[in-house]
Curated annotation (Swiss-Prot):
Monomer. It is found in: Cell outer membrane. It comes from Shewanella sp. (strain ANA-3). Keywords: Cell outer membrane, Chaperone, Lipoprotein, Membrane, Palmitate, Protein transport, Signal, Transport. A lipid is attached at C26 (S-diacylglycerol cysteine). This is Outer-membrane lipoprotein LolB. It is a lipid-anchor. GO terms for biological process: lipoprotein localization to outer membrane; protein transport. PROSITE patterns: PROKAR_LIPOPROTEIN (PS51257). Residues 1-25 form the signal peptide.
């Protein structure tokens, strides 16, 4: 937990500092030129997406709330946490074989994003499974615990770690032609994460019409 305390202290220092600023620009992820917005029938069709929302992390010792920006593809994940004023406090850039975390002016690297986050922060955040859960999908190792009156998944359990992760889909919304969660809660022991997706956009490579120059 010492890692967690140092990690959250660093982030809260950034948040407190941003409160002294009169102006703060909202720093978003760099553009990905080979991906364009698209419409899908269901979230599973989107091999890439980007979202804007909020993330809240709670433990018995600490609480953290921040804006969340995330661009996901099969080749890369780019995740940014910012304060309400738009000041960046954390960035994570990950591929299947490498991960780079920047927080409080320091850089950390590992071959695995999930292992890197746990080593630096003390949080065992399921970064590898979150892309499925964020889009309301059930993984091969997930067990459905409850469904709602419409047959939509309401709660799942993932037992890859002990204690297991329990994911509750609190509400849903239409985005990019699909139904995706609006709010979801993740719990594992005394660690709780809440996610709110204010905007979710499916992305894909733009199609080139016949006879049209690329």
């Amino acid at each position: 937990m010492n890692n967690l305390k140092r990690f959250t202290k660093s982030i809260f220092s950034c948040i407190a500092l941003s409160g002294l600023l009169f102006l703060g620009g909202c720093e978003t992820l760099p553009p990905t030129t080979d991906l364009s917005p698209m419409t899908v029938d269901n979230a599973a069709q989107a091999k890439a997406w980007e979202l804007q929302g909020k993330l809240a992390i709670r433990t018995p010792q600490d609480k953290l709330s921040a804006n969340l920006y995330w661009r996901h593809s099969e080749e890369r994940d780019e995740l940014t946490l910012t304060t309400m004023l738009g000041t960046t406090v954390l960035t994570l850039d990950a591929t299947p074989n490498s991960a780079h975390l920047h927080v409080d002016g320091k850089d950390f690297r590992d071959s695995n994003a999930q292992a890197l986050l746990e080593r630096v922060s003390g949080w065992s955040i399921p970064i590898n499974d979150l892309p499925l859960w964020i889009t309301g999908q059930v993984g091969a190792l997930d067990r459905v615990l409850a469904v709602d009156s419409n047959g939509k998944t309401k709660q799942i359990q993932n037992s890859q770690t002990l204690p297991p992760w329990v994911v509750t889909f609190l509400s849903w919304q239409p985005q990019s032609g699909a139904e995706v969660p609006y709010q979801l809660k993740l719990e594992r022991g005394d660690l709780q994460l809440k996610l709110q997706l204010n905007q979710w956009q499916a992305l894909g490579k733009p199609s080139i019409l016949l006879g049209e120059k690329p």
